[in-house]
Amino acid sequence: MNKNLKNVFFVLIIMMVVLIIAYNYENNAGATKDISYSDFLNMLEPVEGKKPLGKLYKGNVDKYNKIQIEKDVIEGFYIPSEYLESKTAKPVKFRTTVAPLDKDLIASLRKANVSFDARSAEEGKFWSVIGSNILLIVILIGLFWFIMMRQIQSTGNKAFSFGKSKAKMTMDPKVKITFEDVAGCEEAKEELVEIIEFLKDPKKFHAIGARIPTGVLLVGPPGTGKTLLARAVAGEAGVPFFSISGSDFVEMFVGVGASRVRDLFDQGKKNSPCIIFIDEIDAVGRLRGAGLGGGHDEREQTLNQMLVEMDGFEKNEGVIVMAATNRADVLDPALLRPGRFDRQVMVDLPDIKGREEILKVHSRKVPMTSDISLHSIARGTPGFTGADLANLINEGALLAARKNKKRVTQEELEEARDKVMMGPERKSFFISEKEKEVIAYHEAGHAILGTLLPYTEPVHKVTIIPRGRALGLTQSLPKEDKHILPKTYWLDQIIVAMGGFIAEEFKFGVTSTGSSNDIQQASNIARKMVCEWGMSEKLGTVNYSGDQTNVFIGRDMGHSSKYYSEEFAAMIDKEVREIIQTCLNKGRDLVRKNASKFEGLAKALLAKETISHEELMTIVHPANEEGAKKKPEKTVKSKKQNGIKANPAYNE
């Protein structure tokens, strides 16, 4: 039944109810008055000296002018005495009981020329009472049921079917997503293409004795494209695709989750071959027996049912389960074993090539100028996910539209990247001249050390315009993605982090609260060098941090987070202080030796507020000096760097 027919049906029911109510009201207009039999006879044959109640109605309307006789009951209409002279008087309905011995009633009626009619007590009552009142009740119940069902369907639920699966089946979506719309995760695509080939041509795999994986688990950080990959599989497979969220299984009603799992797999078997996709499966697949509330709850029942459905006594031939999560560490081991989720596909952060491909995909529908360099944007966005890059392109388009441009230029993309990475500019934020000077020298300290040290990333931009929660920023962008970072790199990172502290100390003789985050960052690096990365000779290659994964309440509570004695705790603190102090001394020496460049950069920041990489290199490396950052020598003359031994292998 389409929407228009439903509306017509709804209107007809309302009209019927209104008509029945009006009919009953008309029939029962005015209350029936019970009178004595003597009063009735007095109106029929008035007695001298006794005033009658009125006059029996004998008008032209058949509805009123007949006396109805049903066994010992008489009903009719009369006009009260006080309204006899009125032409608009409305008859009053009366009822009386006939005396059982009155045999002259009929003769009296005939003598008075009163029309009358006799009927049995049952006649007409079924249709008048049952036909109107009960029919009205039935219609009202039907109307209530219709409204209730319509309301339930409009909210997407099913009445009395809490245990039914909420999975949505996709066969041929209008907006079809394919693997051409997915970039930056080629290995993951290859794994999934194999599953699609099996669904399209299973004989090819059966002939060689291969068994397709029962389940595929997509694992990766948020925003890397796990759900997008699943949508691409739905577009490519050409088979029914059921999608559901892990949170849709668990409700407030006990047993609903397990029932929905059964119903979901029943639907899958009926539509085999098919794919079932469960997004955020960690909502239902968490480790059993772990938690403050005990080992048995609704989630465990749901998980147990899912384990049975995926690999129990009954085989689900042709039903492939896909799932996505960014918390694979909290999933139950029984869910991850071969036979259930045979294959785990890692969807990690894209590298520079992957980021460039993702930018190309998202920029297809965005008009851009011909001089756009997506490679430079990709190089300047390390650690960005696919969702971040899509947001960057959208922000660039919004900025271009705000400037009334027809095409997006490199300027908008650069500005959008800075906005996504560092937050929007707060040009209206008031800063006094004294504070602005402190900020300028603080950022100049970061920038000058980041440019002079050999193992740091190139400084891309320095600004004293507040962005987000920061009052000033020094942005460094790597030339390439790095996966193995040596000790020398981290030592230089500590020096750069403390650059603002060193600059304030050198220029003003005192430091400010603006260095608090820098100190925290440097301390974290130094502590990891000592406790996790084995970069301390005194403490050796021992892990003092324990398991650094996210705590799972119930499994990890009560476990000690301290893996060393008080003696070693003091040694760790001492080693961390020594590393930071050594880096501070080297940073102070560099700033002191390059004081003129440091002053020039700070004054340029006060004048321009933002300094680009090219302007920075002009200040730090004038034309008469070497125009590039000094590179480390290929041979190691000394095995120590500022009193801390460095690994010679990384200096080559």
Curated annotation (Swiss-Prot):
Keywords: ATP-binding, Cell inner membrane, Cell membrane, Hydrolase, Membrane, Metal-binding, Metalloprotease, Nucleotide-binding, Protease, Transmembrane, Transmembrane helix, Zinc. Its main location: membrane. It holds the Pfam family FtsH_ext. It is an enzyme of class 3 (hydrolase). NCBIfam families: FtsH_fam. It is a multi-pass membrane protein. Its cofactor is Zn(2+). Binds 1 zinc ion per subunit. This is ATP-dependent zinc metalloprotease FtsH. One of its GO terms (biological process) is protein catabolic process. SMART domains: AAA. GO terms for cellular component: plasma membrane. Residues 622-652 are annotated as: Disordered. It is found in: Cell inner membrane. One of its GO terms (molecular function) is ATP hydrolysis activity. It comes from the Bacteria. Residues 623-636 have a biased composition (Basic and acidic residues). Residues 1-4, 150-652 are cytoplasmic.
